[in-house]
Amino acid sequence: MTSPSTSKNHRCLNLISKCKSLQNLKQIHAQIITIGLSHHTYPLSKLLHLSSTVCLSYALSILRQIPNPSVFLYNTLISSIVSNHNSTQTHLAFSLYDQILSSRSNFVRPNEFTYPSLFKASGFDAQWHRHGRALHAHVLKFLEPVNHDRFVQAALVGFYANCGKLREARSLFERIREPDLATWNTLLAAYANSEEIDSDEEVLLLFMRMQVRPNELSLVALIKSCANLGEFVRGVWAHVYVLKNNLTLNQFVGTSLIDLYSKCGCLSFARKVFDEMSQRDVSCYNAMIRGLAVHGFGQEGIELYKSLISQGLVPDSATFVVTISACSHSGLVDEGLQIFNSMKAVYGIEPKVEHYGCLVDLLGRSGRLEEAEECIKKMPVKPNATLWRSFLGSSQTHGDFERGEIALKHLLGLEFENSGNYVLLSNIYAGVNRWTDVEKTRELMKDHRVNKSPGISTLN
């Protein structure tokens, strides 16, 4: 199969990119066959690429009709499938890879251009993670070390990062002589989104080591970790860097800055960032409403929620969590109930346990404990520890011993190894002079082999 220069310049090839329907595509395909370009790699690769976006089954049929297709054509179709169909057609990408492996031609073998797309596909969903690990072994088997170029290495880093395997991702990253910006960003984002201990500290350390100029994605990871750590000064530095280097204050950078300033107690700075953003998505509104909620500005949070809707945006599941929470922190019970009821009735969003948790907190904080308890009994999902802990707090605040005891017993059932729950129960019993129950609680701790963490002081 050849690829002469004439095959690249024929006028019909310019029409391929303009095809918008399967009918147009078939007409161009017929013309390619008629003028004798059906055995040339370049026009076939363009045809495969576009047909995979218009009609994937037609693209696969084209490949089947090609006698002895080259690995370049296989790579083209694999890459296009992964780029245009995300996880929905991952099985087809791996099916094509299997065809490469089973080819009898000595010229059809996987190369350094085969694997990056497949590693990307492997990271889409947990069911494909084992395939990605197998691909790693194939890289070592089929590619010479000299062909382990930075694109393959970067794809490996991305795969393990997407799987949450930060140790493996970091080990592979350290072997890359000169990581490009995309690879740096991949690892930074993986650490920033991880719940592992010290992952945010790793983001700060990695950022200081960067050998390339950071962009907006780099700064989002840095600002997010600064927010989690309360690193206000470094977060402000990142904001200044964005402004001085004329980077875009897009939705991602803006949302991370709003979260940073809100968590550090600088709500006016957060609002200034929000107001200065030229484009705001639902996540931006959610971050700002969350900040207002935490600082007790529930009415302002509701106004922002209404503004979101008036702008033509559709609230998502997280929007209702932060907005009902804003109502809860400000005692706006009726408004919170109205917003909760609109979730399913207006927007078709089925409430989850976190929404019911906000509702229980809303009712409990206002002293409507009977309604909160009734809500727990009727909710269609199983209450979690966070919900029971909220109900416990409200019961203690309003002096309802019986409901507090119920909440704690449920907490013990969910977190029997948490010594704090036993201490709380013991304190409740001690507060009403039920010393026999205090002793029983301590015996229960011994039976479950739960040790109370000793108190410490940081004062010298």
Curated annotation (Swiss-Prot):
Alphabetic keyword roster: Repeat
GO aspect biological process, one term: RNA modification
PROSITE patterns named in the record: PPR
GO-annotated molecular function: RNA binding
PPR repeats: 70-107, 111-142, 149-179, 180-214, 215-249, 250-280, 281-315, 316-351, 352-382
Pfam families listed in its UniProt record: E_motif (PF20431), PPR (PF01535)
Domain of life, per lineage: Eukaryota
Region annotation (Type E motif) ranges: 387-460
NCBIfam families per the UniProt record, alphabetical: PPR (TIGR00756)
Recorded family membership: Belongs to the PPR family. PCMP-E subfamily.
Record-given protein name: Pentatricopeptide repeat-containing protein At5g43790
Organism: Arabidopsis thaliana
Lineage: Eukaryota, Viridiplantae, Streptophyta, Embryophyta, Tracheophyta
